[in-house]
Amino acid sequence: MIDDNIENNEQTINDIAEEIVETANPEVTALKAEIEELKDKLIRTTAEIDNTRKRLEKARDEAKDYAIATFAKELLNVSDNLSRALAHKPANSDVEVTNIIAGVQMTKDELDKVFHKHHIEEIKPEIGSMFDYNLHNAIAQIEHPDHAPNSIITLMQSGYKIRDRLLRPATVQVVKKP
């Protein structure tokens, strides 16, 4: 009888425990679902913040790299003029002219150093190299039996780029098909 009583009490306790779990289970399930939803939102928000930070860093770096592009474009003509002056120096000249030419050369060299410091590269295609519309601007087509079609026959003006962005295309003449 005592054993039966104990069994009945244990059964009653188990029934009560199951009833409590069944009553609490929807609440626990709802809370677990809410926790999972909040974890998911946290992960997504963290990823979004990280992506935004990366985009801002990239934009900042690009702005820093390309901020001088407009100014550099204006200096390209200065570089061209210095090069033209050096290309037309007289063969026989007195000391004063020689000193002036040396000064022009030093100025050109210094400008080239500044260009290099700011990742500004000259685009100077070789004669015979193939025309690339991304880097070159063809102003004329000339028939020439010794060169392949679409190859560069004359460099009219050097081009320039800053890192991977084109500042000015190289102006060229290309060979056309006969």
Curated annotation (Swiss-Prot):
Keyword Chaperone belongs to the record: yes
Keywords: Chaperone, Cytoplasm, Stress response
InterPro entries in the record: GrpE, GrpE_coiled_coil, GrpE_head
Predominant location: cytoplasm
Compartment(s): Cytoplasm
GO function term, MF aspect, one: unfolded protein binding
GO biological process, one term: protein folding
GO cellular component labels: cytoplasm
Paired cysteines (S-S): none
Gene3D superfamilies xrefs: 3.90.20.20, Head domain of nucleotide exchange factor GrpE
Family: Belongs to the GrpE family.
Function: Participates actively in the response to hyperosmotic and heat shock by preventing the aggregation of stress-denatured proteins, in association with DnaK and GrpE. It is the nucleotide exchange factor for DnaK and may function as a thermosensor. Unfolded proteins bind initially to DnaJ; upon interaction with the DnaJ-bound protein, DnaK hydrolyzes its bound ATP, resulting in the formation of a stable complex. GrpE releases ADP from DnaK; ATP binding to DnaK triggers the release of the substrate protein, thus completing the reaction cycle.
Name of this chain's protein: Protein GrpE
Provenance organism: Rickettsia africae (strain ESF-5)
